[in-house]
Amino acid sequence: MSTEETKKEQALQNYRDRLIEHKNAELRLNKAHELIKKLKKDFQKTEDHIKTIQYIGEIIGEVLRSLDEERFIVKACNGPRYVVRCANYQDKAHLLVPGARVTLDLTTLTILKILPREVDPIIFNMTAESPGSVSYGEIGGLSNQIRELREVVELPLMIPELFIRVGIKAPKGVLLYGPPGTGKTLLARAIASNLEANFLKVVSSAIVDKYIGESARVIREMFGYARDHQPCVIFMDEIDAIGGRRFSEGTSADREIQRTLMELLNQMDGFDTLSKVKIIMATNRPDVLDPALLRPGRLDRKIEIPLPNEAGRVDVLKIHAANITKHGDVDYEAIAKLADGFNAADLRNVCTEAGMFAIRAERDYVMEEDFMKAVRKCQEAKKLEGKLDYQKV
């Protein structure tokens, strides 16, 4: 082998060695970068822990009034009142109104932050319940009632200028009344599901408290929360629990319920007609409600949710039977004729019972005969129910 070839081979070997060294150096560099990144993250975490340990708490207070542009009288949570100044006043001037909750520095008592209003946990529980996904197409036989309800609740929230142009005041609230099982709560859930608004679901019986004044306070906080989180829809189910007719005699519990009703009447008069707070009430006993609650200006529209007629029963049956595995044709009209006097909940029960008959027969599909058997079975159960008679509101 010549000298030139030897030199060439040696140069190639050196090049290969250098390439391997370069690759190894790159790997070491990448590992070093990863280590630096991890150390930085650990350093930041340690810094946060140190800040948390060294953090000095703040006092919560309430603004009573402003003395001038920069000084405020604030009542601290532990009792004393102070004249204080505000850090970054220009950014917070419009929020420092009487009643605003603020945090104060422990040493200088300077206003540092503005807190949201205090909300009772009961109110948060009202907002936590999800209405679910309910479309108007899932409600059968109530097209007129849906239109009337949407006119009262949706239009003022979505297109308020329409009422200003026409020159009328938007309705404040609506009462849904009718026999049990006709879809009053389902209508409210559909409104909540299809409307981009906050939704408070209130069970009226849960508001009543054994301590005097507590029930009225919950009503005040409920409407206060609704005003702060507009647009908001308040749905009060079983309103007859607190909205019953007032009378002079009664126990202390009856008087507490009457005080709760008076607070509700006061709050319903309180908010502006075109504000984005609407109230829906539901009951199956409209005859026991107080006349002051029913008057226009509080509940402007009363919508009766009646038992479905034959066409309505067919619609409801088709909606509930849509997801059922069926074999052969099903004559919904014949089933609806047999189900005279049934409400929507009964018709849903008919579909469930039809499925149970199919399971009992060890089938994975439902036939028309199962629906007929289910209707007859539900008719026997309906005989146990009492009939509720009341006049239209």
Swiss-Prot record:
Q: Which InterPro entries match?
A: 26S_Proteasome_ATPase, AAA+_ATPase, AAA_lid_3, ATPase_AAA_core, ATPase_AAA_CS, NA-bd_OB-fold, P-loop_NTPase, Prot_ATP_ID_OB_2nd
Location comes to:
Cytoplasm; Nucleus
The entry's cellular-component GO terms read: cytoplasm; nucleus; proteasome regulatory particle, base subcomplex
Record-listed ATP binding positions? 178-185
In terms of domain of life, where is this protein from? Eukaryota
Record's keyword terms, sorted:
ATP-binding, Cytoplasm, Nucleotide-binding, Nucleus, Proteasome
Question: Which GO molecular function entries does the Swiss-Prot or TrEMBL record give?
Answer: ATP binding; ATP hydrolysis activity; proteasome-activating activity
Cited Pfam families? AAA, AAA_lid_3, Prot_ATP_ID_OB_C
Tell me which positions the record assigns to the signal sequence: none
Tell me, which GO biological process terms does this entry list?
ERAD pathway; positive regulation of RNA polymerase II transcription preinitiation complex assembly; proteasome-mediated ubiquitin-dependent protein catabolic process
Family in the record:
Belongs to the AAA ATPase family.
Q: What does this protein do?
A: The 26S proteasome is involved in the ATP-dependent degradation of ubiquitinated proteins. The regulatory (or ATPase) complex confers ATP dependency and substrate specificity to the 26S complex.
Write down what this protein is called: 26S proteasome regulatory subunit 10B
Which species does the entry assign this protein to? Dictyostelium discoideum (Social amoeba)
Q: What is the lineage of its organism?
A: Eukaryota, Amoebozoa, Evosea, Eumycetozoa, Dictyostelia
> Gene name, please?
psmC6
